[in-house]
Amino acid sequence: MDVPVAVNEDKLLLVSVGYSACHWCHVMAHECFEDTTVATFMNEHFVCVKVDREEHPNVDKVYMDTVTMISGSGGWPLNCFALPDGRPVFGGTYWPKASFLRILSLMASMYQEQRAELLGQSAAIHDACSKMYSVKKADAGSGVTRIDLTTTTTALSGRFDHLLGGMGEAPKFPMPCVYEYLLGYAAQAEREEKEERERDGPQPEAPYSATRPSPEAESERVASHVAFTLECMARGGIHDQVGGGFCRYSVDAGWHIPHFEKMLYDNGQLMSLYSHACIQMASQDGPPSPLLPLFRRVVSETASFLERELLVSVPSDREGESPIAFLASLDADSEGGEGAFYAWTHTELREVLGETDYPLFADFFGVSDSGNWEKGLNILKCDKTPEAFALSKGLEVSNFLERLSAVKSKLLDVREQRSRPGRDTKALTAWNAMTVVGLVDGYRALSDPGLLSLAVRCGTYLRDVVMGGGDPEGSGLTLLPGQLMRVCTVSTPEGADTPTVSLSVNGFLEDYAHTVAAFLALYRVTFEEEWVISARLCADHCLQYFPRDMSGDGTTTTLLPFTSSLDPALPSLTVETEDNVIPASNSVMCEALLSLGALCTTASGEEGDTPPYTTIAKNMLRDVSPVFKQMRGLGHSNWARLFLQTLTVEPVEVCVLGPSHLEWGQRLRREVDGLCVGARVLIAASSGEGSCIPLLSEKEALYTERGGPDTLVYICAEGACMPPCDLDGALDTLHRLM
């Protein structure tokens, strides 16, 4: 990764990494980079490179891992010093002006006077990073067991904050994939306990053991804590009580005061998480959870926020509604400072709401005359759900909800007149794909066709624009089949009547993984095979250009590198395995390949065409197993969810063929969602001829032999396929199997 200017001028690189919505990035830019003294010194002694981490996460990861290794923590802005060939030597995060000048002076003098020491330090960092990214091919017998998952759950449970929700101390991040795993673990444990009770009949109650609680007690505690955490987040200031959507994290332990930037990836994933919680709650025996209405509103209001504030229409020659994309983020800052757009004085609220509504809703939103934040400002939060608050005040719930909706509309109208936070101008492929999945999950939870429409239009953008064979503006950009571009900017040049689209940055593994997942999510609710075709095209490109055996000698992992072989080499070739706020790209691709393989595998167990998606995915699970067990699954929650599915879920295949395939497929899909067993059941549907999906084309031959024309359902489970049946028979069979 030589930087010619740095090589020619014999200077260190100073790589500064940030992103549009980062508050402290803007602070350091103003204090240091815009200061004449600092900027002059930087330009005299260094070759300075500014990097948007959202556009180039591969560069960010190389230098962030270095800084984390050196200091024990990371964050943005990220400032890293590197040799002219790009190898890092030292770095840190935010530095105020005086500290930054001292560090600049020290690094400049060390490069001139102690270069050998810097070279040695760089070599040590490079070796450490190479070991970090080296995941060897594991033995077949080293896989994760159910006991390992119990260990993971116990370790996570030990970090629960039972008073305020979430885990650990401030700052608190939502961490959707952690709670997705815990939701799945609790649901699976509940199913197993139910099966055990039905099999064994009533049993005498076992004595409680504080050191070894029963699985049932653990599953109940896990499910309860997930619901409690989602409630606390929904009631807190991290959730925009007026406009919907979530901020990036809470600076306090009680989810009250957010760091006000709003990120697309958070909101897409949280839509999925709250939707899955809704589906799980709705499927439980007995009365519905009192939290279900709150969680439904969170899903709906988050989608409304995305549509209102981040959506852009993308030019297209296709008939019908235009494709859409969602922009990456909203800044924390506006003209009034950090959070000013979202905060209220009690005087402002009283003027907007009037004397009739103000006392009640000031109480509901935790407003005080002196403010509940800083400088007399209030961040709206709720100590109770709307339903619980209404009952505590002796009010009719439905009437209070109507008044609350009207109050939110008034506040939103007033807020829209304020100076707005900066909005990023780029759309990122991976984050849009996450949002497609979130919208699909929201549709499955709420049965709101508007959410499905948004998902399809954004999926169309992913398929036809960023994977569509070239830049619509004729920039000379030519894409290979299935290749993705990461960054899309939609803008209207001065004097032009129509917006233009500009694509840049070759896609990274996370773009491919999430896009394949998005296409498959759309197929599951539309049964339109074009989504499977696109998923295969995208996955095949990824498997070709993200080499699995990077050593060439067959000894390295089947896990995929983060960067395509089409891109210039970086100082380290990163392999992302750790699930963070965004799950590891390898874990997402692994799940996508498992799903794709299920559609492309026949009853004989053969995968229709190469590459063998299922085999690759199983090898990925095998190779990540040693590090998963070493870490007790901590930092690997999405992997834990995949292991849980593959260890405990016997998949059921449902193929619907015939003239009513769409209607029947949708009916069966709704039934599966109602039973909360979506991960266990694969539903595919076709008219009965010409399917491009191997799982269906195999059944089409059987369907044709019967002569049609009736619609039939073919169900395979537990290694055996049952005789074809009608819709009622299929529903009965699913209930029996579940």
Which residues does each predicted region cover?
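Extended, hydrophobic alpha-helical segments in both membrane/secreted and soluble proteins
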Residues: 21-25, 246, 267-270, 439, ...
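Long, polar/charge-rich, low-hydrophobicity segments
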Residues: 282-283, 308-318, 467-513, 520-695
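Glycine-rich, phosphate-binding/catalytic loops in enzymes
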Residues: 31-34, 454, 533
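Replace the tail clause
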Residues: 1-438, 442-445, 471-477, 498, ...
